[in-house]
Amino acid sequence: DFHRIFDGEFIEFVKELKAAGKIHAIGLSSHNPVIAKKAVETGLIDVLMFSVNPCYDMQPPDEDVEKLWADEVYEKTYRNFNPEREALYELCARRGVAIDVMKAYAGGDLLKADLSMFGKAMTPVQALDYALTRPAVAAVMAGCKTIDEIRQALAWCTATPEEKDYASVLANVEKC
């Protein structure tokens, strides 16, 4: 898929639209840090929609997004930040590629202790702060379904540093 997009007619068409002023930015959506990094390295994209949360940031990269939610993945102990994700975030920051975050709550799993790989629930404010403090992150799409969920997400705007602090959740990760 990567070569079909970046080596074909599609990218040429998109570049023409940008040059003509019909679009302002070229973006890409991905769940895989290796593919996303490769796209950023082309120098063609301006914005990357990417899944950012502490759960996914510790998992190995994969083409299959469904594996991010697999029980066997959550049952494993991950001890380190995924180096591919770290390299992607740093590259985006250096190149001025904005990251628009999706899946900040890991599909809701991070908000429930029994589903979180950390064994402890994060608050929406903590999950949003985690995402917003990664390099190159410009925005987070919280994925709210109800008015109450919107209020919980907006609470980040007035939250204290103590309310934003997610260290107590990540402290449950075993050390190397």
Give the ranges of each region predicted by the language model.
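Beta/alpha (TIM)-barrel catalytic core signal, keyed to glycine-rich beta->alpha loops juxtaposed to Asp/Glu
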Residues: 1-176
